[in-house]
From Swiss-Prot:
Gene3D superfamilies: YgfB uncharacterised protein family UPF0149, PF03695
Entry-linked InterPro entries: YgfB-like, YgfB-like_sf
Name under which the protein is recorded: UPF0149 protein ETA_28040
SUPFAM superfamilies associated with the record: YgfB-like
Database matches in Pfam families: UPF0149
Family: Belongs to the UPF0149 family.
Superkingdom of the organism of origin: Bacteria
Species in which this protein is naturally found: Erwinia tasmaniensis (strain DSM 17950 / CFBP 7177 / CIP 109463 / NCPPB 4357 / Et1/99)
One GO CC term, this protein: cytosol
Amino acid sequence: MSLTNIMPGYNALASVLTQQGVAMTPAEMHGLISGLICGGSGDRWQTQVHDLTNEGIAWSQTLAQPLQQLHDATSNALEDDGFLFQLYLPEDDDISVFDRADALAGWVNHFLLGLGVTQPKLDKVKGETGEAIDDLRTIAQLGYDEDEDQEELEQSLEEVVEYVRVAALLCHDTFTRVSAPTNVVMKKPTLH
């Protein structure tokens, strides 16, 4: 089952977001929800999305239903060892590489926002995950030159998208996986 079969359509979600007065793209909303999930928000995600996007007020069913769909599909993809998890970026043939790069930057910015809400001490995270978070901060600020070769930019963009995907999976693994307790009972040595 592919992720696109259970996600709301990108353009349909864009239309609903606009109709509901939400100044976010579907990529940004997916980044926010992904950040919340990867940070371990659990059942609080809806309240957090309402707080961050609508002054704490719940959305109408017209928007709540596709957002629930987006959350569930994303959560399921992340829990499936991440193999199905993909960034929700515009894919249409008429979307330029520059628009996709802008969508990626928006996704990353909102991912970091969601992650920061659930993990307020992100700057203290060390190791591989800390490095990935620092890289995401840099990626969120990347720009491009419209005079660049579009094929070369497209290839570079795909590599960055894959890196961001793996960084998100690493964050999910770091912040949501609880190490399993061991069943081994250590016995203290007995003195005879």
